[in-house]
């Protein structure tokens, strides 16, 4: 489960990230509560607007942020973004402590936080894979999610108590201090031990990433599922804060709900770390579980029963996000990883500006329970999309007389080897849905899926003359 800890760089990163993320969750709790109760009178629409401004920049700047993450030193990018976020937290703290903060000013700062995070997120996600060997990338992503959710377990509860005891301004001060842990960790990274980064031969930013994703039907499905739930189901600040008020709780009660959600989230992240690779079917089942758990939570009559169901909501949410993130990272061309992850983060974070205002309006007009049901319905639709794609992507053919079954679970890339090379690979039955790629056919070169053992090949297939066989399986339905 913890094999990525064998890398010194990842260990340093992990512990720095926990401290920084605790502060981040404390600040998130304080910001939501300030907008909902101090700057407005329980206005969920204003809270949705704040979330839209904070999470909108990743969508608007996706073409630039992904290219920056691919072209420049990711460690230095993170040093700049983390320092910027720390300075912004100090500014908000000063305005709150001097009692001059207004809703328009908070909206401006939310947008500034969003711009900084737009550059931080793809670089941060891609940098995780830079610190470990490729075979440990999925494990590192899952442990990174566990770190995030360990902080989510602690941060909101501590933040809620700090708001009641000290005031919201001091919570922003505390978050600014925790950024120092991440900055120190980045400075201690041994750059010589980072994984080499291949350069993509073609120039281009967003268009190159989009073209790559469009050529991958599996990624299109993953992005679609994550977008639906991200837009309508993952508006937890709105759901938890309005439900806390529904049950007549204060900031500490809201913080407890966020921490309870993190109990399930942490469990999901740790279980994901045990899996050796990300599977699309796990993503699909998690989406369905999220939909069911969300709808059930909306029906709970008491604060305690609602909190209990939130454990399952958190579990399914993080299982889905960790699986999707790991799948994207481990199946993407390393030279394009930053751009593809920028698109992924734009889908995850950029869905919020679309869904948060709608969720806020529904909560104001029909109550928070109705808004939660809408989010649950989005999870059911995402499950249906994943199930439909899996049904229609079953058996594929490499050629008419040599059939082999590809499942939808593999995260390892296809390897190009010399046709005369007699390399035995583990007979693991798993592979991604094949992707058509244009390759120049060179005599003596063939493509062999990693999951096919030499003993499984026919005598004809072992012969050198098979060098120019079709390198890509047929699409579904081409029997």
What are these regions (language model features)?
Residues 1-424, 477:
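Alpha-helical transmembrane-bundle signature of multi-pass membrane transport and export proteins
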Residues 403-479:
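Long, low-complexity, intrinsically disordered cytosolic termini of multi-pass membrane proteins
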């Amino acid at each position: 489960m913890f094999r990525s800890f064998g890398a010194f760089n990842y260990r340093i990163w992990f512990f720095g990230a926990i401290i920084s993320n605790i502060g981040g969750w404390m600040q998130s709790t304080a910001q939501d509560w300030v907008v909902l109760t101090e700057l407005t009178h329980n206005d969920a629409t204003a809270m949705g607007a704040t979330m839209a401004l904070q999470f909108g920049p990743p969508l608007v700047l996706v073409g630039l942020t992904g290219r920056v993450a691919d072209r420049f030193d990711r460690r230095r990018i993170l040093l700049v973004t983390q320092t910027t976020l720390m300075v912004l937290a100090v500014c908000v703290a000063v305005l709150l402590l001097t009692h001059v903060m207004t809703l328009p000013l908070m909206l401006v700062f939310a947008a500034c936080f969003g711009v900084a995070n737009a550059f931080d997120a793809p670089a941060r996600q891609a940098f995780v894979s830079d610190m470990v060997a490729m075979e440990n990338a999925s494990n590192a992503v899952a442990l990174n999610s566990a770190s995030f959710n360990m902080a989510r377990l602690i941060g909101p509860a501590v933040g809620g108590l700090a708001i009641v005891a000290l005031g919201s301004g001091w919570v922003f001060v505390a978050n600014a201090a925790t950024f120092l842990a991440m900055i120190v960790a980045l400075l201690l990274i041994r750059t010589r031990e980072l994984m080499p980064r291949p350069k993509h031969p073609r120039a281009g930013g967003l268009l190159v990433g989009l073209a790559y994703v469009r050529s991958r039907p599996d990624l299109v499905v993953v992005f679609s599922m994550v977008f639906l739930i991200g837009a309508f189901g993952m508006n937890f600040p709105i759901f938890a804060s309005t439900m806390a008020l529904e049950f007549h709780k204060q900031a500490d009660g809201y913080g407890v709900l966020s921490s309870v959600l993190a109990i399930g989230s942490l469990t999901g992240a740790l279980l994901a770390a045990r899996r050796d690779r990300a599977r699309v079917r796990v993503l699909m089942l998690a989406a369905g579980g999220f939909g069911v758990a969300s709808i059930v939570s909306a029906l709970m009559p008491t604060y305690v029963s609602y909190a209990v169901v939130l454990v399952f909501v958190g579990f399914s949410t993080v299982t889905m996000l960790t699986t999707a993130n790991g799948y994207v990272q481990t199946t993407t061309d390393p030279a394009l990883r930053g751009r593809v992850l920028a698109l992924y983060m734009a889908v995850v974070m950029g869905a919020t500006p679309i869904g948060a205002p709608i969720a806020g309006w529904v909560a104001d007009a029909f109550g928070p329970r109705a808004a939660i049901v809408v989010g649950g319905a989005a999870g059911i639709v995402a499950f249906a999309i994943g199930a439909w794609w899996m049904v229609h992507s079953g058996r594929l053919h490499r050629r008419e007389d040599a059939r082999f079954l590809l499942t939808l679970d593999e995260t390892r890339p296809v390897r190009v080897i010399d046709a005369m090379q007699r390399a035995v690979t583990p007979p693991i039955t798993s592979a991604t849905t094949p992707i058509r790629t244009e390759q120049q056919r060179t005599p003596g070169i063939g493509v062999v899926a990693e999951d096919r053992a030499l003993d499984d090949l026919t005598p004809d297939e072992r012969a050198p003359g098979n060098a120019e066989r079709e390198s890509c399986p047929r699409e579904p339905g081409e029997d």
